[in-house]
Regions:
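ABC transporter nucleotide-binding domains
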Residues: 3-6, 13-195, 200-208, 212-214, ...
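Solvent-exposed beta-strand sheet faces enriched in polar/charged residues
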Residues: 9, 71, 264-266
Length: 281
């Protein structure tokens, strides 16, 4: 059996407050696992410990107690991060470099050179849909384009694990949809994704499993479908149902102990509706 992509065991992080005898517990006794190939959503309100957890997994912050592993290797070691790509919230790029030069720069950091580096740069620009902006300076990119070049740099070394902190922050609905589709494409490629986001509708569309943090404590964790299912209700979706059939169903329900709580027409999502009326034909 293969090791989890991410294993977090009894993780605690406490920050002392300087010049005071007080402490802030950012994460408390957190344990969870992200299996290879999953898209895992780490959710919670601001200050719940999401970013702290991500930083500990990436070796950017040391834990007070507990341990984290990446594909079975201690995440504090440099070797464990060879298989990891990271997109932080609000990433900073050198604004006078072009998109192509930016990926070339990160490729060199990852040890790529020559023809392989040039080919990888072209592949990534195509992957994130920025071929036509390859020679434009980063300073002229929109927020959505910056996030996409950020995803491209996270993919430079062909990682098995992507850690994404608010990848759609500040992006309009069209850009958000493009990033969502990229994450789904990563999933098809077998890449594991640990995602932190406040956009719950998007999380519902792309995540296999979620964990919800509140005040540093994991309050809910499991498969998304299991967590959002309402056990006492059953949704019945019919196509081409005649009025007579609906009347028969309602009569059968009336004879039983169940009751019809709601009958309504299917709805699209606000995101889809917005895109339909704002995108050019």
């Amino acid at each position: 059996m293969s090791a989890p992509a991410i294993s977090i065991q009894n993780l605690t992080k406490i920050y002392p407050i300087p010049f005071k005898r007080e402490k802030v517990v950012a994460v408390q006794d957190l344990s969870l696992a992200v299996e290879p190939g999953q898209v895992y959503g780490l959710l919670g309100p601001n200050g719940s410990g999401k970013s702290t957890t991500m930083k500990i997994v990436l070796g950017l912050v040391s834990p007070t107690a507990g341990k984290t592993e990446i594909f079975g290797r201690d995440s504090r070691t440099v070797e464990s991060r060879e298989d990891v790509g990271f997109l932080p919230e609000n990433p900073y790029f050198y604004k006078f470099l072009t998109g192509s030069e930016t990926l070339h720069f990160y490729g060199k950091i990852c040890g790529l050179t020559g023809a392989k580096l040039r080919e990888r740069t072209r592949e990534l620009l195509a992957l994130v849909g920025l071929e036509n902006a390859a020679d434009r300076r980063i300073g002229g990119y929109s927020k959505g384009m910056l996030q996409r070049i950020g995803l491209a740099q996270a993919m430079v070394q062909e990682p098995r694990l992507l850690v994404l902190d608010e990848p759609t922050a500040g992006v309009d609905p069209a850009g958000s949809r493009e990033i969502r589709d990229l994450i789904l494409d990563f999933k098809k490629r077998g890449i594991t994704v640990l995602l932190c986001s406040h956009l719950l509708g998007q999380v519902q569309e792309i995540c296999d499993r979620i964990g919800i943090l509140h005040q540093g404590v994991l309050v809910r964790e499991g498969k998304l479908d299991d967590l959002i299912s309402i056990e006492s209700q059953t949704e019945l979706i019919l196509e081409n149902a005649t009025p007579e059939l609906l009347a028969e169903i309602q009569a059968a329900v009336a004879k039983s102990q169940a009751r019809v709580v709601e009958q309504r027409k299917p709805q699209t999502t606000l995101e889809r509706y917005f895109l339909e009326v704002t995108q050019k034909p």
